[in-house]
């Protein structure tokens, strides 16, 4: 797995928080990042994918059709990651003899 692959899940997480919380500033607060860093991560994701995911305006954020599809898929992937981590942690619980 390349370093780029590791970064993809982070980009996905940031993008999902922006959508769920309705904006870059709210996502930045939740993720303990600066709004600028969140905006740059989403812009980098869009550049890598070659498609705009979010139509930005001063008043509200609106997903493009591609952004909506990417969000739907992202939340399923992130849920799978969380489930895998939870299951691994349960299996790693120390047990007495």
Please report, for each region that a protein language model flagged, where it lies by residue.
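A short, exposed helix-loop element centered on a Lys and neighboring polar residues
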Residues: 82-89
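Residues within the DNA-recognition helix of helix-turn-helix
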Residues: 34-37, 41-44
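Short alpha-helical elements of helix-turn-helix
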Residues: 2-21, 39, 68-71, 75-78
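Interdomain hinge and pocket-entrance segments immediately C-terminal to HTH DNA-binding domains
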Residues: 90-97
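A short LG(V/I)-centered, amphipathic sequence patch enriched
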Residues: 46-63
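Alpha-helical residues within the helix-turn-helix
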Residues: 29-30, 47, 68
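Short helix-boundary/capping micro-motifs
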Residues: 17-32
């Amino acid at each position: 797995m390349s370093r780029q692959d590791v970064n993809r899940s982070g980009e996905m997480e940031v993008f999902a928080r922006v959508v769920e919380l309705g904006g870059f500033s709210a996502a930045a607060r939740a993720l303990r990042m600066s709004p600028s860093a969140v905006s740059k991560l989403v812009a980098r994701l869009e550049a890598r994918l070659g498609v705009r995911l979010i139509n930005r305006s001063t008043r509200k954020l609106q997903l493009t059709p591609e952004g909506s599809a990417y969000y739907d898929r992202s939340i399923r992937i992130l849920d799978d990651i969380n489930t895998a981590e939870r299951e691994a942690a349960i299996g790693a619980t120390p047990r007495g003899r």
